[in-house]
Curated annotation (Swiss-Prot):
Biased composition (Polar residues): 318-333
Biased composition (Low complexity): 308-317, 360-371
Region annotation (Disordered) ranges: 1-28, 308-378
Segments of skewed composition (Basic and acidic residues): 8-19
Tissue specificity: Intestine and unidentified peripheral parenchymal cells. Slightly higher levels in the cephalic region compared to other body regions.
Example of a GO MF term: DNA-binding transcription factor activity, RNA polymerase II-specific
Keywords: Developmental protein, DNA-binding, Homeobox, Nucleus
InterPro entries referenced in this protein's UniProt entry, alphabetically: HD, Homeobox_CS, Homeobox_NK-like, Homeodomain-like_sf
Record feature DNA-binding region, as residue ranges: 377-436
Stated family: Belongs to the NK-2 homeobox family.
Organism annotation: Girardia tigrina (Planarian)
Function of the protein: This protein might be involved in determination and/or differentiation of nerve cells in the continuous replacement of neurons in the cephalic region.
Name listed for the protein in its UniProt record: Homeobox protein DTH-1
Gene coding for it: DTH-1
């Protein structure tokens, strides 16, 4: 125990059996135990703490305290037993921050009553920042044995997890029981206390302990290891669950066992207010909001699991842009209903031209086994009735892409599954795109052929005589042949005007210039005198 002014610091160090690890015959100085005196009835209105030294008058009404939570806690904050007025000051009538849990060993024959938040396993240990205690007024049931002569029970309950830091999560229903003191012998305020009983909690093995101090006339400074108080483990198992909180979920991978100490964890006690008989009768649990928790990093005996939040799709969300399915290997497949033809589902759904023919469902498993691909099976074709096809086509003309609710509505309307409707729309969009593509190719081919024919026709016309009346331009002929001013014979001119006679005109190949140059010039001159050179 270290004392500084009006403060006391507890650095207790007990083994799992609840006894001091110091082998000396007296309690070590760093251990604070109120064994140096029991306050009498004249001090009944004051909550008193007595240190280990011989100064019985050393009083600490407020003190910052640090307690090893995983070790035996002897926070013997107590006062003498005795009856007090039932009109004592109450704790938390306005919703105080603490839950004080009294007990009555004389009536209930047990020394501890756990809170409802306690379960069977201890899953996480945390730390509180230091705080000061106010003095605690005693509270007793009127005309009954004294209960809660001195007791403190701290419930770490955080109703607003969003206020806490990410690295310092706390449970929203964890409960840490530190100390409960009791007097099992009813006395009046004027009598001397006799064998007051105190209860502490051995967080090392998650069991509460009861020990009795001798009377004031006995050992004034008893030895914890020898003639001092005898520790008795109660049968009530305690635990402190850690529940899921946001933004992260921390929990230990295995429970706290009785032989697994966590000596590295420490707990500082926040402020405690006064209690009274009225509050004890009316409530057993009062929540408080403690946002300043520090988590120890020494968890070598455990595996700390940190579950990060994952933004996974909600399978129940009807307006999702995709639907999930399971393939033959139990692996999820996402079928996107998007205009991208590369993501089209390869399932086959075919139309049945005969709505009354239901026997035409094709299942060619035997044919596939004989074709060489034994491991591959052809998918069963789904045949639609004429009524279903008409309804599907009508909706397709209205809307090329259906949302999930629209698919489900249409499927219920025509007696199909939403997947069948989706695949039909995918196949129909693919067929429409393919038809448009083929039509575009066909139109392109026609345009190309038209341009080729026009080019060939223009090339053939360019080899005719200059004044051949076909309404064409003879500049190509005049510029390339360079034959001078050739005038056609009237007979030749007439041949171009008479139907059926134009086929008798000479036809020139592509190399018309070389071909024409090879013609005998004399032949041209002699054949018709009207041709001039």
């Amino acid at each position: 125990m270290s004392s500084n002014g009006d403060s006391v610091k507890y650095d207790t160090n007990f083994d799992r059996e609840g006894y001091s690890t110091d082998s000396s015959n007296e309690c070590p100085n760093q251990i604070d135990d109120p064994l140096n005196g029991i306050p009498n009835s004249q001090n009944s209105e004051n909550f008193q703490l007595y240190s280990r030294n011989n100064n019985a008058n050393e009083l600490h009404e407020t003190f910052p305290t640090t307690i090893p939570i995983a070790q035996q806690v002897h926070l013997s904050s107590f006062r003498n037993s005795g009856m007090v007025n039932s009109n004592s000051r109450s704790i938390g009538p306005d919703g105080s921050i603490y839950s004080i849990q009294p007990f009555d060993r004389a009536l209930l024959q047990r020394n501890f009553i756990p809170n409802d938040e306690m379960t069977s396993n201890m899953s996480f240990v945390q730390m509180l920042n230091s705080a000061n205690y106010d003095q605690i007024e005693p509270a007793f049931y009127q005309n009954m044995p004294g209960i809660g002569n001195s007791f403190m029970m701290q419930s770490i309950l955080n109703p607003n997890p969003n206020d806490q830091e990410i690295d310092n999560p706390i449970s929203d229903n964890s409960t840490y029981v530190l100390v409960q003191g009791d007097s099992n012998i009813p006395t009046n305020p004027q009598s001397n206390p006799i064998n007051p009983t105190y209860v502490s909690l051995d967080l090392n093995d998650c069991r509460s302990n009861m020990f009795e101090y001798p009377s004031q006339t006995g050992h004034q400074y008893p030895d914890i290891n020898g003639n001092g108080p005898r520790l008795l483990h109660c049968k009530q198992e305690l635990s402190y669950p850690q529940t899921n909180i946001s933004p992260f979920d921390y929990r230990l991978s295995r429970s706290m066992q009785s032989n697994t100490p966590l000596s590295s964890y420490k707990l500082s006690l926040p402020e405690i207010k006064t209690i009274s008989n009225d509050w004890i009768k009316g409530s057993q649990n009062v929540n408080f909001n403690q946002n300043q928790l520090l988590r120890s990093t020494n968890v070598s005996d455990y595996t700390l699991i940190k579950n990060l939040p994952q933004n996974l799709p909600n399978p129940n969300q009807t307006d999702s842009i995709y639907s999930s399915s399971i393939n033959e290997n139990n692996q999820p497949i996402r079928n996107y209903d998007s205009p991208n033809p590369d993501r089209e589902d390869d399932s086959e759904i075919h139309e049945n031209p005969n709505p009354h023919d239901t026997s035409s469902v094709e299942n060619n498993d035997n044919e596939n086994s004989s074709s060489g691909d034994i491991g591959k099976k052809r998918k069963r074709r789904v045949l639609f009735s004429k009524k279903q096809i008409l309804e599907l086509e009508r909706h397709f003309r209205q809307k090329k892409y259906l949302s999930a609710p629209e698919r489900e509505h249409l499927a219920n309307l025509i007696g199909l599954s939403p997947t069948q409707v989706k695949i039909w729309f995918q196949n129909h969009r693919y067929k429409m795109k393919r038809a448009h593509h083929e039509k575009a190719l066909e139109m392109g081919n026609l345009a190309v052929n038209r341009r080729l024919n026009q080019s060939m026709f223009n090339d053939s016309k360019s080899h005719l005589p200059g004044n051949f009346e076909l309404g064409i331009n003879n500049s190509f002929y005049n510029s390339n042949l360079a034959l001078g001013n050739l005038s056609l014979n009237p007979a030749v001119n007439l041949m171009g005007r008479i139907p059926g006679m134009s086929s008798m005109l000479p036809t020139y190949p592509n190399g018309s210039q070389s071909y024409f140059n090879n013609i005998n010039q004399a032949t041209l001159t002699g054949s018709n005198s009207s041709w001039g050179v």
